[in-house]
UniProtKB/Swiss-Prot annotation:
PANTHER family: GLUTAREDOXIN (PTHR34386), GLUTAREDOXIN-LIKE PROTEIN NRDH (PTHR34386:SF1). Disulfide bonds join 16-19. It comes from the Viruses. Keywords: Disulfide bond, Redox-active center. This is Gene 56 protein. The keyword Ribonucleoprotein does not apply. It comes from Mycobacterium phage D29. One of its GO terms (molecular function) is electron transfer activity. Signal peptide: none annotated.
Length: 90
């Protein structure tokens, strides 16, 4: 789950190519995140399905944005811009 050091959580499952792409975008930008495999965490799966009302992955949760559900590279770019600007003090 998210910590003060990793403000982004990506909920995913094995074999999810869009999840891998999103992780690669964040890695390339140097943005830290946690990954939660929904097939191994029943509590997280319930949270994603019942609270977030998400039926597809990836699901990206952060304190500063609405959850990003599904593969939405434009929204991920906004998230990256926000976190990289925050790190540089802009």
């Amino acid at each position: 789950m998210r910590t003060m050091f990793t403000p982004i959580t990506i909920y995913t499952q094995p074999g999810c190519r869009p999840c891998h792409r999103i992780q690669q975008f964040l890695d390339d930008a140097g943005v830290e995140y946690d990954v939660v495999d929904l097939t191994r965490n029943a509590e997280a799966k319930t949270y994603v399905q019942d609270v977030l009302k998400a039926s597809s992955v990836p699901v990206i949760v952060t304190d500063h944005f609405e959850p990003i559900i599904g593969y939405q590279p434009d929204k991920v770019d906004e998230l990256i811009d926000y976190y990289t600007a925050s790190e540089t003090g802009l």
